[in-house]
């Protein structure tokens, strides 16, 4: 392989990597929600229509397992594996524990986030429901760090 051919291959590889990264950035907020089986979890008073203010599944091992799976299917694409963000979306390990963190989580989970007509996070509340949302939050609580 000549230097010229090697250099051309390197430039082509860099161009492909740039296009792939750009496509990933544009895809942010364009997520098709994946169903979450929450039938093993206790029902929440109010169902999906009347969201409660605090996580009823904190520390519930079954909810944490369901939440981990649901996060991997629906959240990791933007927020990163194990809730460690690559910098595009908030790193959810730093989401406060307790009522203030619950409030922030529910607002974003239910309604998503958009600014100036750009969708940064689609709403998941109606599609996945309250039980799945709180299960994801229960799992996120196990990843909390203040460092």
Model regions and ranges:
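Electrostatic cytochrome c docking/interface patches
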Residues: 35-70
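Short sequence/structural segments immediately N-terminal
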Residues: 70, 145-147
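Bacterial N-terminal signal peptides
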Residues: 11-20
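The canonical Cys-X-X-Cys-His
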Residues: 67, 71-81, 105, 121, ...
């Amino acid at each position: 392989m000549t230097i010229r051919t090697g250099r051309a291959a390197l430039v082509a590889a860099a161009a492909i990597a740039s296009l792939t990264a750009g496509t990933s950035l544009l895809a942010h907020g364009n997520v098709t929600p994946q169903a979450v089986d929450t039938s093993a979890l206790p029902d929440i008073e109010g169902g999906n229509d009347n969201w409660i203010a605090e996580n009823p599944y904190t520390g519930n091992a079954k909810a944490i397992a369901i939440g981990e799976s649901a996060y991997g299917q629906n959240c990791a694409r933007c927020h990163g594996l194990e809730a460690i963000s690559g910098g595009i979306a908030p790193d959810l390990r730093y989401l406060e524990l307790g009522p203030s963190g619950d409030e922030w989580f529910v607002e974003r989970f239910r309604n998503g986030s958009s600014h100036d007509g750009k969708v940064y996070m689609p709403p998941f509340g109606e599609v996945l429901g309250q039980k799945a949302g709180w299960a994801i939050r229960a799992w996120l609580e196990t990843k909390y760090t203040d460092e």
